[in-house]
């Protein structure tokens, strides 16, 4: 699963990766569209789709935490 990720910082940060991935998986489960899942994960979760998924999952107030975690995964 981790081999094909776009995020260089996945190894050693699997718990963080799991938290961020969960948003995309939940978003996919709501919309049932593989383009949503791919778009959410695009660019190591730095896509506009990820932000839209946070909004759809009613987790916008957690955006600062997710922004920090995505920064860790992109390190």
From Swiss-Prot:
Modified-residue entries (Alanine amide), positions: 75
- Name the family: Belongs to the arthropod CHH/MIH/GIH/VIH hormone family.
Location in the cell reads: Secreted
Protein name, as recorded: Molt-inhibiting hormone
How is this protein annotated for GO cellular component?
extracellular region
Disulphide bridges: 7-44, 24-40, 27-53
What does this chain do?
Inhibits Y-organs where molting hormone (ecdysteroid) is secreted. A molting cycle is initiated when MIH secretion diminishes or stops.
Assigned keywords, A-Z: Amidation, Disulfide bond, Hormone, Neuropeptide, Secreted
Q: Name one GO molecular function term.
A: neuropeptide hormone activity
User: In the UniProt record, does the keyword rRNA processing occur?
Assistant: no
Its Gene Ontology biological processes? circadian rhythm; neuropeptide signaling pathway
Q: What is the scientific name of the source organism?
A: Procambarus clarkii
């Amino acid at each position: 699963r981790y081999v094909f990720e776009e995020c260089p910082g996945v190894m050693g940060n699997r718990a963080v990766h799991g938290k961020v991935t969960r948003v995309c998986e939940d978003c996919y489960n709501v919309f049932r569209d593989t383009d949503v899942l791919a778009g959410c994960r695009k660019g190591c979760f730095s896509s506009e789709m990820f932000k839209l998924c946070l909004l759809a999952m009613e987790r916008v107030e957690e955006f600062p935490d997710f922004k920090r975690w995505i920064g860790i995964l992109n390190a």
